[in-house]
Amino acid sequence: MTQGLDVDGARLERGRYDLWVGTEPIDVARVAAALEDESLGGVALFLGRVRSPNDGQVVSHLDYEGYDAMILATMASLADEARTAYGGTDGRLLVAIHHRLGRVRPGEVSMAVAVAAAHRAAALAACAVVVEEAKRRLPIWKLEVGDGGARYVAGAAVAGEVL
């Protein structure tokens, strides 16, 4: 695969993963296509959407900010760690992580994580851990704007297993 800039945002593809960050809407079909491998029978997909209300406040939108190169490097680390932990003895695990930057409105997808593994248990476990670690480690800041004003909010990672 190749490394380079997409029309919008940055994309890094390196054999076993597909990573993207940009301001255009996330293409869920493209995320799923990155996992096409008939030898892998378990596929797990997580879509994170902006919600409203949040903490009792109506949300107009979230403004996501981040540094593309640093985000992609962190995504690559997450994908490599997942492959090591859940890819079995042959490392057979495909990972796609896409995150949107800029203005994202309620109902729109801000993050997609998908994992394909030989079996469903590994795919589901790896997907869950990548989502939680992405929320914790990606250098992305989000400004929530709504009827209560604007405030920076932290990613709500759930305490649990770490890669």
Question: Model regions: which residues?
Answer:
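N-terminal, polar/charged subdomain of small-to-medium soluble alpha/beta proteins
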Residues: 1-109, 116, 124-128, 132-163
